[in-house]
Amino acid sequence: MVLADFISIPTVSIACLAVLGIAYHRHQSNKNTRRPPGPKGYPFIGNLLELVSAERPHLLFPLWIKQYGDIVRFTVFGVENILISKFSTAIELLEKRGAIYSDRPHMVLENEILGWDAAMPTMRYGAQFRKHRKLSNALLNPNAARGYIAIHEEVSLRLLSALAAQPDQFYHHILIYATSTIFRISYDIDITDDKHDLVRLANGAVRKSAEAYQASGALVDVFPSLKWLYNSYPTTAPFSGYRKVIEDIKGEVVQANNIPYEMAKEKMRDGSATRSLVSDAITGLGGLDAISPADEHDIRGLAGILYAGQETTMVTITNTILAMIHHPEVQRKAQAEIDAVVPLDRLPTLDDRANIPYLEAFVKEAYRWACPLIIAIPHTVIQDDVYEGYFIPKGTSIIASIYDMLNQCPNAAAFNPDRFIDGTDLGDVPPDPRDVVFGFGRRRCPGLHVADNSVWAALAQLLASFEFLPELVDGKEVLPPLKWGKEMARHPQPYRCRIVPRENRKHCYAA
């Protein structure tokens, strides 16, 4: 039974009663202002019923964009939300007006109940966020990220060997690649298989927190007083099963934040530590004997930044393999360039990046076509504003539809790296899709340089080392379906393929 089964009916009922007066006041005070178009909704509850009845609320957004245009307004219990689907709008609001558009919604479930309060992605904009941002910029800037290149290349080499040995387990091996990279860089912990307890913790804490938020998080964000349902509701009362679900998730979050952090500290104490985010942060603050409990809280949150990159890295790579199977001519062109530039006695490295322009365009198209997320985490405006004649009241959540922004180009379904070389077929897609995928303005992902290096290293070495081909069924090639799951992370539906080593570089990774 999922969390939603326990709480949807009672929490919605309580919330409806609690909000009538507030919503009516907001409706009366705002009804004469010009707002963006959007679904009309009902008095008091707004568009709640449409969102609840949808299998996944975010799947409604592309439909609303198609129906109402590039800027769409919807409400839930009087709380304003604006969905934007043009890159130019995101730049104007979230970057140029970043001083007032950099807050987050009050994420009560994630930050106050589940324990992600030190995580920058969901942190409110203020002194604590600026402190974390300063620390992350020092430890994750482009020059600092280059210091981890050897880790990317070592872990990607391990990926190649695993794929050569077990090509049918490619999902598993790509997951290990993404997870191992994160734990090496964040904590100096080497992970070689998915049976490791830390893999379970990292995957479980992030995935279960996201599921809990989709089930009920938005409601408790609107009505923080409902926290008692999560913290104090009697365990013997009806509908109390969700309490155990929440407590279990909280326990996993605590362990995911604490266990690898303590392991990294222990390696520093016994002198076996190599460079990591944790060791760099602790050293920068004066060492193990100098850091305060507040410092440690901040460092745990900083190290956990990269957890979010684990899933998006895996999604990007698995989607790109799917694209290569459907566009073999693109795969061959990228391989030909690599073979022409990189000597056959080694694999491409990040030091080669500037000399392989088609591969760079290939990676950009991978971010666009294989877009790992449907929407970005919402920004919240901290004061009233006006955009293109539309009134945007204080407290409005701005939701960037990443997927739509990256598909506003001719032949969007085609995987075509040339669009980033000659500039044709770009449409309204920015020249660098990373400007969308990694977020906007002051909320841009601080780990973007590490994440981008991880994606580039994997794709470059996969292209150099293997051919990705359709599955053979009764001697005939069968293309995998272009279908995706219904979560906000765009995992492709499980597919099968052939992964065949390229003989000219097999010696570079074979044991």
UniProtKB/Swiss-Prot annotation:
GO terms for cellular component: membrane. Belongs to the cytochrome P450 family. The gene is eriC. It is an enzyme of class 1 (oxidoreductase). It catalyses: erinacol + reduced [NADPH--hemoprotein reductase] + O2 = cyathadiol + oxidized [NADPH--hemoprotein reductase] + H2O + H(+). Pathway: Secondary metabolite biosynthesis. The chain crosses the membrane at residues 2-22. CDD domains: CYP64-like. PROSITE patterns: CYTOCHROME_P450. Its EC number is 1.-.-.-. One of its GO terms (molecular function) is oxidoreductase activity, acting on paired donors, with incorporation or reduction of molecular oxygen. It is found in: Membrane. SUPFAM superfamilies: Cytochrome P450 (SSF48264). Heme binds at residue 445. Induction: Expression is induced under erinacine P-producing conditions. Keywords: Heme, Iron, Membrane, Metal-binding, Monooxygenase, Oxidoreductase, Transmembrane, Transmembrane helix. Its cofactor is heme. It is a single-pass membrane protein. This is Cytochrome P450 monooxyhenase eriC. Cytochrome P450 monooxygenase; part of the gene cluster that mediates the biosynthesis of erinacines, cyathane-xylosides that show unique biological activities, including leishmanicidal activity, stimulating activity for nerve growth-factor synthesis, and agonistic activity toward the kappa opioid receptor. Its main location: membrane.
